[in-house]
C-alpha cells in the first residue's frame, strides 16, 4: 500500500499487511490488492470507500432476500444482514469463505463457496460490488444476476471509475486483478444491455477527504515531504477516515466523470 502522498494509489503486488486483532479462531486474511479488508489501518481509506456503498444499499433492501455475490471477506454481507430478511454471501476464494463463515454470524446470514457465474438461489436483490472489472465476460455475469432476481427485483453493481483511478495520462490503473476498467458511459451501456432501467450514482469524497483534496491542489503533497510530516500525518489521518467522508450522489445531481466509483441500480 502506498503512503498517502500519492494518497489514493495502491501498491498491489506484495501482501505486506494482514488483518489485526481477529476474533479467536478466525484466521486473518492477507491484503493482496484483489479485495479490500477491514482491520488493517493502512487500508482504511479503501475499506471505508467500499463499506459506505454497502451501508447505502442496506438502507434499501429492508426485509428482502439478498445475494451478495463475490462477497470477499464478508463484512458487506454482515452490513446487509442488519436490515435484510436474509443474506447469502458467495465467494469462490476458500480462505475468504472460511474467514467470513467463522467471523460473521447472524441467524439471517450464511456464506456459500461458489462461482458468481453458476451460483443460483432465489433473491429479491443481488449485490455485485467492485467485481465486474475483474471479469472477462461481464455481460454473462450481469445476465446471470438478472435471472436470479426476476421481474420486480433489483441488482446493485459497482465498479471504479477508470477516469479517476488510473494515473494521469494512463488508460487504466496498475491493478493486475482488473481485466477491464470503465468510464461512465461504457459502464452504463453495459448495464443497460441487460436491464430495463439503470439508475447511475457516483461516489465522491466528502468532509475531511474533500479538505485533503483541496490541500493537495494547494501543494500539500509537495510541502509535507520537506517538513518530514508524511509518515506521521498519514499514520493518524488514514485510520481516522469514516464512511461519512464519502458521499453517493445521483447522476443527475453530479458530473459522474469525476466520481471515484460508479454504482448502477438495475431493474429487469
PLM regions: where:
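Class I S-adenosylmethionine-dependent transferase superfamily signal
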Residues: 80, 145, 191
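Short catalytic micro-motifs in class I SAM-dependent methyltransferases
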Residues: 130-134
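Short alpha-helix
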Residues: 179-194
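A structural helix-start
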Residues: 135-139, 159
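Short, glycine-/aromatic-enriched active-site segment of Class I SAM-dependent methyltransferases
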Residues: 157-180
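Substrate-binding/catalytic lobe of Class I Rossmann-like enzymes that use SAM or dcSAM, i.e.
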Residues: 190-215
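A short glycine-rich, Lys/Arg-flanked "PGG" loop and its adjoining helix->strand segment in the class I
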Residues: 139-151
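Conserved N-terminal segment of class I S-adenosyl-L-methionine
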Residues: 2-121, 125-129, 139-142, 177, ...
Amino acid at each position: 500500500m502506498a503512503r498517502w502522498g500519492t494518497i489514493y494509489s495502491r501498491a498491489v503486488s506484495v501482501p505486506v499487511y494482514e488483518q489485526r486483532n481477529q476474533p479467536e479462531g478466525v484466521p486473518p486474511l492477507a491484503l493482496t490488492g484483489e479485495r479490500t479488508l477491514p482491520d488493517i489501518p493502512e487500508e482504511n481509506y479503501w475499506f471505508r470507500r467500499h463499506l459506505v456503498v454497502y451501508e447505502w444499499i442496506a438502507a434499501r433492501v429492508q426485509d428482502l432476500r439478498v445475494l451478495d455475490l463475490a462477497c470477499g471477506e464478508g463484512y458487506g454481507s454482515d452490513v446487509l444482514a442488519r436490515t435484510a430478511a436474509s443474506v447469502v454471501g458467495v465467494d469462490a476464494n476458500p480462505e475468504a469463505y472460511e474467514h467470513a463463515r467463522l467471523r460473521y454470524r447472524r441467524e439471517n446470514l450464511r456464506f456459500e463457496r461458489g462461482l458468481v457465474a453458476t451460483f443460483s438461489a432465489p433473491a429479491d436483490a443481488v449485490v455485485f460490488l467492485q467485481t465486474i472489472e475483474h471479469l472477462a465476460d461481464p455481460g454473462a455475469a450481469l445476465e446471470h444476476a438478472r435471472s436470479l432476481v426476476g421481474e420486480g427485483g433489483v441488482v446493485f453493481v459497482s465498479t471504479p471509475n477508470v477516469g479517476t483511478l488510473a494515473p494521469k495520462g494512463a488508460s487504466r490503473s496498475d491493478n493486475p486483478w482488473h481485466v477491464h476498467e470503465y468510464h461512465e458511459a461504457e459502464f452504463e451501456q453495459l448495464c443497460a444491455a441487460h436491464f430495463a432501467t439503470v439508475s447511475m450514482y457516483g461516489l465522491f469524497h466528502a468532509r475531511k477527504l474533500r479538505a485533503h483534496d483541496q490541500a493537495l491542489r494547494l501543494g500539500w503533497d509537495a510541502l509535507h515531504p520537506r517538513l518530514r510530516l508524511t509518515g506521521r500525518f498519514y499514520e493518524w489521518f488514514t485510520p481516522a477516515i469514516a464512511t461519512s467522508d464519502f458521499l453517493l450522489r445521483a447522476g443527475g445531481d453530479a458530473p459522474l466523470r469525476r466520481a471515484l466509483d460508479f454504482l448502477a441500480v438495475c431493474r429487469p
